[in-house]
Amino acid sequence: MKLSMPRFDQAPVLVVGDVMLDRYWHGGTSRISPEAPVPVVKVEQIEDRPGGAANVALNIAALGAPASLVGVTGDDEAADSLANSLQGAGVRALFQRIKHQPTIVKLRVMSRHQQLLRIDFEEPFATDALALAAEVDALLDGIKVLVLSDYGKGALRNHQVLIAAARARGIPVLADPKGKDFSIYRGASLITPNLSEFETIVGGCADEHELVSKGAQLMHDLELGALLVTRGEHGMTLLRPDHPAMHLPARAREVFDVTGAGDTVISTLAAAIAAGEELPHAVGLANLAAGIVVGKLGTAAISAPELRRAIQREEGSERGVLSLDQLLLAIDDARAHNEKIVFTNGCFDILHAGHVTYLEQARAQGDRLIVAINDDASVSRLKGPGRPINSVDRRMAVLAGLGAVDWVISFPEGTPENLLSQVRPDVLVKGGDYSIDQVVGADIVGAYGGTVKVLGLVENSSTTAIVEKIRKTDKAE
């Protein structure tokens, strides 16, 4: 399945559910307490992160999608911290604040990137999110997906009211379920239990065949549009009525912390579906996103550039020969990491030592080097009959194998102005005895503040000379 980056900026999502604050106390541990056989942690940093439904909304916003959140909190410092964090991330948050009851806080004591202790401050709320029914109703009119983020803490008590309101508007409903009664999610478009939550409802599954069979029955009984079971190191399984099961392997390279991984899955699904992606594609993106987030410590969100980079790895486009769409994504990601983009172009028909030296010098002008080459038809127009000696595919393959070259792309025109206008490199490099104003594309690059550099060529290194030498040798023989 080929993955691509959705237009998340056109994908508004509403999250309703259990809001909580994940608080971290970071410190050093060098001794055991004289009072009891426990480590002493000297707290050096206190960090607050949105958790639960707030983390789902944060993940959606981090992908670039408009995110709204409705939940229940106390009227306290923790709620203020949540509100400030969410506002800073661009999330529109509406809280029903309950006096004389604390906001749910999960406090984790950390030392040397290890969790030593977790302390929960919580009381189930008697008031649910529908205390803000008018606000929820108004928000539903401007969204494309509704997410129910259920942690069983009391903010979600009237699931069916929310599901019915969304379905009446044609809005898909995604639910991250909790508890022993999944009937409260009847009619949802998709639910995303982990394997343990799933088996709590349907019983143990000895193998994938049994998982698929029991999942199909659950979908039928609850009138679900689809079911996604997340299975940790075994990946995830998507079930849909009248479709074969879709099993996706886990994508994590390293696992540091699974905290919030389920939030990342449902948030990526929601944003992708809101952007118009088909469910299998959205699940593929969610699987990649989960692989990223478990490589981070604590409750974390993934950014759009991180997801783009994962897609590029998946499609083999982190380096090498790229299409224009792939190249533009790669450039966006590189710029998100403050990398300088260098561009050069040519025919590169027979690669020789002069080319290699020149490309190494070009690469030294920045962090990433794009080499754009004329396709076969344009080389023939420029160089005459019998050229190119090597086809465009072979020329690109050889260039892509050089350590100095990051990305290779071809263009059909005689000169690369059209490509330069789209790529907008930071530095345009040309080899030869030119003045800067003679370099093709210098005006384009200069207009947006880019730099043009002319590098000298290695003497006695010329493709034309090599071709002529070969021809003379052939005639002599």
Swiss-Prot record:
Molecular functions per Gene Ontology: ATP binding; heptose 7-phosphate kinase activity; heptose-1-phosphate adenylyltransferase activity; phosphotransferase activity, alcohol group as acceptor
Source organism, top-level taxon: Bacteria
> What's in the keyword line of the UniProt record?
ATP-binding, Carbohydrate metabolism, Kinase, Multifunctional enzyme, Nucleotide-binding, Nucleotidyltransferase, Transferase
One GO term of the cellular component aspect?
Answer: cytosol
What stretch or stretches form a coiled coil here? none
Q: How does it assemble?
A: Homodimer.
Q: Which family does it belong to?
A: In the N-terminal section; belongs to the carbohydrate kinase PfkB family.
Name the residues that bind ATP: N194, L195, S196, E197
Q: Which segments carry the region annotation Cytidylyltransferase?
A: 343-477
What EC numbers are recorded for this enzyme? 2.7.1.167, 2.7.7.70
| Protein name as it appears in the record | Bifunctional protein HldE
